């Protein structure tokens, strides 16, 4: 929110707390529990049950799949079936790395237009999967999995971060320069289109309002060419569903400094537990 982001699409194994936290802060969220067979068939079944529990309780979300290559065909089919029963899509990591190059063949009979296909780095141009491809340039570079070249896809393409922050203007700039490195004819308007596709995933966010600092020219408040080369743009005020949730750069519903202080206190305990695993 302090970066002007008012919607979150999250794949996690703690979907109830995340949804509650987002509601407390005042932003929109869509959650999915990422099922996997890495812990055996029973683990995948429990993951599906958690997705169903969340969605039937009224949570906004999708059925989550950690990554196609960590799931059996039976689990993928079960996830697709549950999503169809609940009238939601599937949120799945697809062909992020070379280990998942067979994902398209496995998912093609299952995927529908309401699916989110995350990464898609190693998909063929004509992969034949229905759904929206979500491009995560910073994450892909960090993991050294390659460049997805998202402009090649016939699918709608949206922009994401894979959990590395929530500064979507910064992600837009990175998406543009990475595209430009690959294709000298690339324009900031291409990457801006990927960013704007997020509204198709959360149509109600069209009614939310963000005012920015420094103040943009009235004639071109969100010009892709200007923003591609202007860093340091930050939100001054954020309104979600008519409510001001950020005023003068500060959250109105919660004490952000207190939250950070409590997180700093708990971080060493978490690190110690991880060391003990």
Feature locations, PLM:
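Active-site loop-helix segments enriched in His/Asp/Glu that coordinate
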Residues: 1-60, 66-82
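Short, hydrophobic beta-strand segments that form beta-sheet elements in well-ordered domains
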Residues: 7-11, 116-122, 135, 195-201, ...
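Flexible loop residues that form catalytic
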Residues: 13, 120-121, 138, 180, ...
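Short, hinge-like loop/turn segments at secondary-structure boundaries
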Residues: 24-29, 46-49, 107-109, 150-153, ...
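Active-site core of metal-dependent hydrolases
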Residues: 57-169, 179-188
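Ligand/cofactor pocket segment of small-molecule handling proteins
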Residues: 167-170, 174, 182-193, 197, ...
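Active-site microenvironment of metallo-dependent hydrolases
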Residues: 193-277
